[in-house]
């Protein structure tokens, strides 16, 4: 029997409230569970102590028995210092696609050319501009 530590949704429509439960992976999300070990109320502010409550001793017990936490519960347990999450890395997924890479390369080349032109213009000896002549006085009528 594969066990998960997961969230079971309760509460009213648009007012979620979750129980942190130990359940068989084959049972429905909000269905039968083995034990309730905590609660999570996402409507409370993040700094509120009542937002997430977990019985740490029971969580340690179920983790030692082999229950696997879901991503969200793993985050809660990691914050409590009970469980360490594995680092997630998928650099290929976040990489820009082919057309976006072409656009980025073109923008980079244009920027380099502009920088080179500005540098060349700055290094060229500056020719003295002729002094502006004083404006002629207007004829008096």
UniProtKB/Swiss-Prot annotation:
Keyword Heme among record annotations: no
Location of region: Disordered: 84-141
Keyword annotations of the record: Ribonucleoprotein, Ribosomal protein
Keyword Ribosomal protein attached: yes
InterPro entries cross-referenced by the UniProt entry: Ribosomal_bS16 (IPR000307), Ribosomal_bS16_CS (IPR020592), Ribosomal_bS16_dom_sf (IPR023803)
GO cellular component terms attached to this protein's record: cytoplasm; small ribosomal subunit
UniProt-listed GO biological process terms: translation
Any one GO molecular-function label of the UniProt entry: structural constituent of ribosome
Compositional bias annotation for Low complexity: 115-141
Family, similarity comment: Belongs to the bacterial ribosomal protein bS16 family.
Protein name per its UniProtKB record: Small ribosomal subunit protein bS16
Source species of the chain: Parvibaculum lavamentivorans (strain DS-1 / DSM 13023 / NCIMB 13966)
Organism taxonomic ancestry: Bacteria, Pseudomonadati, Pseudomonadota, Alphaproteobacteria, Hyphomicrobiales
Gene for this chain: rpsP
């Amino acid at each position: 029997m594969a066990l998960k530590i997961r969230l079971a949704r309760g509460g009213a429509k648009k007012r979620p409230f979750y129980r942190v439960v130990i359940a068989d992976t084959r049972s429905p999300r909000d269905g039968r569970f083995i034990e309730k070990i905590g609660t999570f109320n996402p409507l409370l502010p993040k700094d509120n102590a009542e937002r997430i409550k977990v019985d740490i001793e029971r969580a340690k017990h179920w983790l030692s028995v082999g229950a696997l936490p879901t991503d969200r519960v793993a985050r809660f347990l990691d914050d409590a210092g009970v469980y360490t999450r594995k680092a997630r890395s998928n650099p290929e997924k976040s990489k820009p696609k082919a057309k976006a890479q072409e656009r980025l390369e073109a923008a980079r080349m244009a920027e380099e050319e502009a920088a080179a032109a500005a540098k060349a213009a700055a290094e060229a000896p500056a020719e003295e501009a002729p002094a502006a002549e004083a404006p002629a006085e207007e004829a008096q009528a």
